[in-house]
Amino acid sequence: MIDLKLLRDNPQEFSDRLAKRGKFDLQPILDLDRQQRELEVERSQLQARSNAIAKQIGEKMKSGNKSDPALEGLRAEAGQIKTTLAELEPKEKQLKDELEQQLLLIPNLPSDSTPVGKDEAENVEVRRWGEEYIPKSKDILPHWEMGEKLGILNFERSVKIAQSRFATLIGAGAALERALIQFMLDRHTSAGYLEVLPPFLINSTSLTATGQLPKFAEESFKCEADDLWLAPTAEVPVTNLYRDEILTAENLPIYHCAYTPCFRREAGSYGRDTRGLIRLHQFNKVELVKLVHPSTSEQEHEALVRDASAILEALQLPYRVIELCTGDLGFSAAKCYDLEVWLPSAGCYREISSCSNFYDFQARRGKIRFKESGQKGTQFVHTLNGSGLAVGRTMAAILENYQQPDGSVRIPPVLQPYLGRETL
């Protein structure tokens, strides 16, 4: 959530920064904030007058002036104030609720270091790693064809079980998926991340804290009877472990890694990536989540990108790092790097990880704070997260980049101990 005080004190500066992301009308928020504060002042003044009247009545009663004509007037005024305060209470609550709902729809301010641009065409390439294999003809099968040829992927039967955009992994395919998950978790825990296995069903409050609700409700699957949602990413349950808590500065930084299946409706992607493992309603992912001191969040963000990149390098998969421009940032992010892996069958890079720094945006929504030793008050932590990695897309990259002339797929050396074999 945005800092309302910052908006109130510097509306033009705030508006200019937000305009780098697109058009947003902040006037309704400023109007609601003004009305709410006016009601607060009125209530405060009435309460002060009520207290003064009560004191006057008490003094007159104590002095024995129970028949003082002024008492009747004071009691009448006190009654009127009580009625007015009772009328103000629902109005104030309504304004507060409306203001909060409006604030929840405003995205995070972009970092000053985020490149300014309208859309993904203006994203900035930071670096590349590895050598891209460019097929001379059709000697590289798309991963879905290779998977079906090897008998390890089945999409047709998945449609029968569920609908389109689901996949069934069979035999060595299921084993490769498990191996990738375990390999990723092993690497991240060795790097200092504490593993978490959270609930896969989450409530609306959790999704609101991390920014998926209320704006992106149509992107997630909901269990209507229980107000529970299927987790779109482990970022949500892991970050919410600390919702409504006050940590100590000594607790920071906190590093977590988590494997979860992820569920997304992909409502805005009709007609895109209709085949294969790239865009599914259900997919596995290993997520990295950090809660850090604000003074270190920029360094922690760069380290997060390195930790996610290390998995691709260990698997010897060519990739590039893209810094997203302001017009392509996710709703909650202030700064974001995407890792894109090379898919030779398409001759292009595809996103496999998104590493975001949210600053205090999520912490403000989720009330995740910390206290410095010996200091008064609390501060909001900074939260970060990144995929480490999307497992299905990693499998797709392996099935394409490791194809052999004899029609087999070589297993990356670091995965061979997990599978006990060298090829698929």
UniProtKB/Swiss-Prot annotation:
Any GO molecular function: serine-tRNA ligase activity
Organism superkingdom: Bacteria
PROSITE patterns: AA_TRNA_LIGASE_II
Known EC number: 6.1.1.11
Reactions this protein catalyses: tRNA(Ser) + L-serine + ATP = L-seryl-tRNA(Ser) + AMP + diphosphate + H(+); tRNA(Sec) + L-serine + ATP = L-seryl-tRNA(Sec) + AMP + diphosphate + H(+)
Assembly and oligomerization: Homodimer. The tRNA molecule binds across the dimer.
Notes on the domains: Consists of two distinct domains, a catalytic core and a N-terminal extension that is involved in tRNA binding.
NCBIfam families cross-referenced by the UniProt entry: serS
Record-given protein name: Serine--tRNA ligase
